[in-house]
């Protein structure tokens, strides 16, 4: 049997896999176990009470976390005219139409989020095979296809996270960095779960937020007792 690393041994000793932890205790555990030489992200996995095989039960959207994600986000915007000026003023790194599409086709994709005004979708639509597999294709449900591109840029810069359940009905996203204050991570998690509750499909029955686990980039998941969170019980 392969030898456990020092970190893996520590996780095995400290984390009770069957326990739901108070949110403050869960965050304290993550901080204690975050021994990587870089500032790890704090990620969340939310098991939803949906049948992902049914299109009317899939959950997709976006929300701005009150304390952001701790990441510097580079934004590309497909738009023109006054919208292009507004996007640039809002902080977008790349703004354009056909010339920006040419950069993408050439493999120059130095950005984390793509936003498009509706009139630009004729251009963006040609890039689906490039942007789609990378999770970068703009979509109205996540607020990345919008006539108000400036607001979308500001949201992306402010720490907006996008979410979409996978084939197992689980949402995976980030809620900050391990060096955030415990209260900041708690409030970010609460904001995400509140957004998910609002996005609950009408066809979904029974318990919607079935399980919530948080982890660091290199760490194991710690299940959170939802009763220790505000307004998401």
Curated annotation (Swiss-Prot):
Protein name: Large ribosomal subunit protein uL1
Entry-linked Pfam families: Ribosomal_L1 (PF00687)
One GO BP: regulation of translation
Family listed: Belongs to the universal ribosomal protein uL1 family.
Reported function: Binds directly to 23S rRNA. The L1 stalk is quite mobile in the ribosome, and is involved in E site tRNA release.
Subunit structure comment from the entry: Part of the 50S ribosomal subunit.
InterPro entries per record: Ribosom_uL1_bac-type, Ribosomal_uL1, Ribosomal_uL1-like, Ribosomal_uL1/biogenesis, Ribosomal_uL1_3-a/b-sand, Ribosomal_uL1_CS
Alphabetical UniProt keywords: Repressor, Ribonucleoprotein, Ribosomal protein, RNA-binding, rRNA-binding, Translation regulation, tRNA-binding
